[in-house]
């Protein structure tokens, strides 16, 4: 397993408090990639291993993960709970109501269900899926096409789902 996809049997290991300065580079990468301000000053920060992923917890909530892409590059991204706490307009893919039940079962996202997306998305980017109506985060996955193709094409897979509302990471009680 490369760690590009989550596995059901992963456990939280090596959970430890960290100082902000020790994870500042990781937080900066995340802030610049998504155009957000994490504002974690004064928060209780922890790191933990979750399978091959490194997880950042802010006040006991897993808000970010560091993982390897299918191309073996290090990627830092918000979890779905992270997107609830830090709304963002970058790297989003917007789906219609019909796509939601499939995503919630861990299915990959087909382009037919995609109605809007960040045009800056490149093939291979980690992206987040939100619903068209409420703009709530639903899933995270690897884009299999660039932004304009995600919006314009009518057939094929749009992204490989790796984390969705209701999965083990979402349900985690810490």
Stretches found by the model and what they are:
Residues 3-53, 57-115, 121-123, 129-174:
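Beta-strand/loop-dominated core regions that host nucleotide or nucleotide-derived cofactor-binding catalytic loops
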């Amino acid at each position: 397993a490369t760690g590009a996809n989550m596995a059901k049997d992963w456990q939280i290991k090596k959970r430890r408090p960290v100082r902000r300065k020790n994870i500042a580079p990781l937080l900066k990468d995340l802030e610049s990639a998504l155009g957000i301000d994490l504002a974690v000053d004064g928060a209780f920060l922890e790191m933990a291993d979750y399978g091959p992923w490194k997880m950042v917890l802010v006040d006991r909530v897993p808000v970010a993960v560091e993982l390897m892409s299918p191309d073996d590059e290090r990627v830092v991204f918000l979890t779905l709970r992270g997107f609830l706490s830090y709304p963002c307009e970058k790297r989003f893919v917007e789906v219609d109501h019909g796509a939601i039940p499939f995503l919630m079962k861990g299915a990959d996202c087909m382009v037919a269900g995609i109605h809007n997306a960040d045009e800056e998305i490149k093939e291979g980017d980690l992206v987040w899926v939100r619903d068209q109506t409420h703009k709530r985060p639903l899933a995270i996955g690897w884009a299999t096409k660039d932004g304009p193709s995600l919006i314009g094409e009518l057939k094929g897979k749009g992204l490989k789902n790796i984390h969705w509302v209701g999965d083990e990471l979402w349900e985690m009680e810490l």
